[in-house]
């Protein structure tokens, strides 16, 4: 009498069914075509660093770059990429420690900040790589005008500056260094190889082989050029080594003839360049940039003071440098080029008593005597302490932004990379100084 109208499922059976059933998930469908609106302006917040970089670039005078563009209105030809885009891409990537042109080209397709800077303009790695090193003179001028603008606003003053050198690993290996005799053999071999490839190219093979042979020929010609440059520098390097009393034959790199083996910060010896930066202690703005292949900092003080005077129409009042810059001729040159300029550097013997009695410093010189007396005062020691807080901070930022090993070769190209870093550093300092609004003292 209590039988149900239809059979009911057992409670245990339904529980087992629920437990053993396949989970329901959303699977990716990568073949589905989608149309999505893209608002590049909405990709970045208002205070994003890319916007700061773009505002800085818009304030620069890029007319020398625009004058090199051959495509003009009313004539045939493909439109060129706006130099402001390339300038902003390199500055922003420098701040983000991205040093490879290929990596930056990929980021222009994948990263929102780079896509915002490009604004829909396609940029390839070859264009980026060429732009990095082709306009060193323009970058040098932009450094001067941008710092001069800060000086006009009262945010930067050349009253007190600090100079320091930082060793940057060159794009060359230690095994690439050869003596003069070996360089001559390498040049003869490269010349013969270029001739053989030229004959092979003139034989007119298939189109594919012709392109391959042409690429190989360009690579060998580039090596031939570098070896010839290295061989031409051998006599001058040997003369400098004899003057300095260095024994042994001179060796130069077949990969980068301008690189020199230097003692690095970790105590090792590797091919490198010596980057010289002069920075204001108030605001930490880079006002002078130079790149040399000298292994020491001696003799670098006067050229940098002269560069700053030439850039801004007046040199610094006080210069702070470490003991590696102490050179009698350099101190005299600074005093002669910029009267009234005081050099704050530790005298010989401050950290090494054995150096205090060398003949070079046992001279009856009023300049040396005044310098020693000044550095013995508590006031001078307090001023000198600002050197580490300025130069070492800038050097650390350089390392953090990828200025450890160069991806280019040659002094000129390496100096262009250093100028990119200086401009990127200064644009962030300018943004901070303008936000603070504190006048320089």
Feature names for model-found ranges:
Residues 2-51:
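Hydrophobic alpha-helical membrane-insertion signals
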Residues 44-91, 96:
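Basic, short loop/linker segments at the boundary and entry of helix-turn-helix/winged-helix-like folds
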């Amino acid at each position: 009498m209590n039988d149900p109208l239809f059979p009911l499922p057992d409670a245990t059976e339904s529980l087992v069914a629920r437990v053993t059933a396949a989970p329901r998930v959303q699977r990716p469908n990568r073949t589905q075509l989608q149309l999505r609106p893209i608002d590049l302006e909405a990709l970045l917040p208002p205070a994003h660093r890319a916007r700061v970089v773009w505002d800085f670039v818009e304030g620069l005078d890029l007319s020398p770059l625009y004058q090199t563009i051959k495509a003009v209105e009313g004539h045939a030809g493909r439109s060129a990429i706006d130099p402001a885009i390339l300038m902003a891409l390199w500055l922003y990537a420098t701040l983000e420690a991205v040093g490879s042109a290929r990596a930056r080209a990929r980021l222009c397709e994948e990263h929102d900040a780079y896509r915002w800077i490009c604004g829909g303009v396609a940029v390839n790695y070859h264009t980026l790589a060429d732009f990095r090193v082709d306009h060193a003179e323009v970058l040098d001028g932009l450094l001067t005008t941008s710092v001069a603008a800060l000086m006009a606003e009262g945010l930067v003053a050349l009253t007190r500056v600090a100079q320091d050198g930082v060793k940057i690993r060159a794009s060359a290996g230690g095994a690439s260094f050869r003596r003069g005799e070996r360089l001559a053999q390498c040049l003869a071999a490269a010349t013969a190889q270029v001739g053989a490839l030229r004959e092979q190219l003139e034989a007119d093979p298939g189109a594919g082989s012709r392109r391959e042979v042409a690429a190989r020929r360009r690579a060998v010609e580039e090596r031939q050029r570098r070896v010839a440059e290295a061989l031409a520098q051998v006599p001058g390097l040997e003369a400098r080594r004899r003057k300095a009393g260095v024994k042994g034959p001179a060796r130069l790199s077949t990969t980068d003839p301008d690189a020199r083996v230097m003692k690095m910060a970790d105590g090792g010896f590797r091919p490198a360049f010596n980057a010289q930066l002069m920075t204001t202690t108030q605001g930490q703005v880079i006002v002078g940039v130079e790149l040399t292949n000298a292994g020491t900092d001696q003799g670098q003080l006067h050229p940098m003071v002269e560069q700053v005077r030439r850039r801004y129409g007046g040199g610094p009042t006080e210069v702070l440098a470490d003991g590696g810059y102490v050179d009698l001729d350099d101190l005299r040159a600074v005093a002669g080029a910029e009267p009234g300029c005081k050099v704050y550097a530790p005298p010989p013997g401050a950290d090494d008593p054995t150096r205090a009695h060398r003949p070079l410093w046992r001279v009856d010189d009023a300049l040396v005597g005044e310098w020693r007396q000044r550095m013995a005062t508590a006031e001078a020691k307090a001023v000198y302490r600002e050197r580490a807080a300025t130069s070492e901070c800038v050097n650390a930022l350089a390392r953090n932004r990828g200025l450890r090993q160069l991806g280019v070769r040659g002094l000129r190209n390496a100096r262009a990379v250093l100028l990119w870093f200086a401009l990127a550093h200064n644009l962030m300092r300018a943004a901070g100084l303008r936000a603070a609004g504190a006048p320089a003292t």
